[in-house]
Regions:
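Basic, Lys/Arg-enriched alpha-helical interface segments
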Residues: 1-66, 74-78, 85-106
Length: 106
């Protein structure tokens, strides 16, 4: 499968920007997990979890924190919709809502 970043009308790619804000180690760990999903799709827990419908999350354990990259699949593409550092037990509703909003705009 091919991996694409969600692109806003302005041309910005929020997940790419978010990844660039992280440390090199964090980017590498998240990138490895994205590549694992790309080449091994479909995958399940503990790396990938379905959030509902066609929305999924990649779950990456980083030093001292946990990252999530929310994505959907279209045809033979994985589209990275939103990325965030998880601070609570459940995924924040606002982050899931934002990913769903972006998915509807595809």
């Amino acid at each position: 499968m091919k991996v694409n970043f969600f692109r806003q009308e302005s041309g910005t790619e929020p997940v790419r920007s978010w990844l660039k804000s992280l440390s090199p180690l964090e980017r590498r760990l998240i990138g490895q997990d994205i590549k694992t999903v790309q080449w091994g799709w479909p995958l399940g827990m503990p790396l990938v979890r379905r959030l509902g419908g066609s929305l999924w999350e990649i779950r990456t354990v980083l030093p001292g924190k946990i990252a999530r990259v929310v994505f959907c699949t279209r045809d033979d593409r994985i589209i990275l919709l939103h990325g965030f550092i998880k601070k609570t037990q459940k995924a924040p509703k606002k982050d899931i809502a934002l990913a769903k909003q972006r998915m509807r705009r595809l």
